[in-house]
């Protein structure tokens, strides 16, 4: 067992280390007008930024479903919406030429690429892969 003075010194050192660690701001994926989210890169946000945003702009009339993706740090989701739903773009949105989807989140890199498939086949495949070794071990 450590003497009381050593325990006290250890606790004081731990408190100093915890309190002196630099505060790290939010990290978000960052890219502009890309068609592929894998082209986005992590970026440390400014202290005033509180959300990560993803903006997807699509052309609903296109048979190819053309789209562009913008990912960024922002001070608020309302700020992003005001920017992308500006008077200039509203004409295109209201006429059906463009569709704009804005999603915001508050955790590091939460605006990254979507998770692996949400299809029933992806779920079934994952379940089979995880149960496979147990089924083989159980044997006939």
Swiss-Prot record:
Q: Which Gene3D superfamilies match?
A: CD59
Those residues forming the propeptide, per the database entry, are: 116-140
Disulfide pairings: 28-52, 31-40, 45-73, 77-104, 105-110
Q: Which keywords accompany this UniProt record? A: Cell membrane, Disulfide bond, Glycoprotein, GPI-anchor, Lipoprotein, Membrane, Signal
Domain UPAR/Ly6: from-to ranges: 26-91
What does the UniProt entry say about where the protein is found?
Cell membrane
Known Pfam families for this protein?
Answer: UPAR_LY6
Which GO BP annotation is one of this protein's?
A: acetylcholine receptor signaling pathway
Tell me, what does this protein do in biology? Believed to act as a modulator of nicotinic acetylcholine receptors (nAChRs) activity. In vitro inhibits alpha-3:beta-4-containing nAChRs maximum response. May play a role in the intracellular trafficking of alpha-7-containing nAChRs and may inhibit their expression at the cell surface. Seems to inhibit alpha-7/CHRNA7 signaling in hippocampal neurons.
Protein name stated in the entry:
Lymphocyte antigen 6H
Q: Which organism is it from?
A: Homo sapiens (Human)
Gene name as annotated: LY6H
């Amino acid at each position: 067992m450590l003497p009381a003075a050593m325990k006290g010194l250890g606790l004081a050192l731990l408190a100093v280390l915890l309190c002196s660690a630099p505060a790290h701001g939010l990290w978000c994926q960052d890219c502009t007008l890309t068609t592929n989210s894998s082209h986005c890169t992590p970026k440390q946000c400014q202290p005033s930024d509180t959300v990560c945003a993803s903006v997807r702009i699509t052309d609903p009339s296109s048979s190819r479903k053309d789209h562009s993706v913008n990912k960024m740090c922002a001070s608020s989701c309302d700020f992003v919406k005001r920017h992308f739903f500006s008077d200039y773009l509203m004409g295109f949105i209201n006429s059906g030429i463009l569709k704009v989807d804005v999603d915001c989140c508050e955790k590091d890199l939460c605006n990254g690429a979507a998770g692996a498939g949400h299809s029933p086949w992806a779920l079934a495949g994952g379940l089979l892969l995880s149960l496979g070794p147990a089924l083989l071990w159980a044997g006939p």
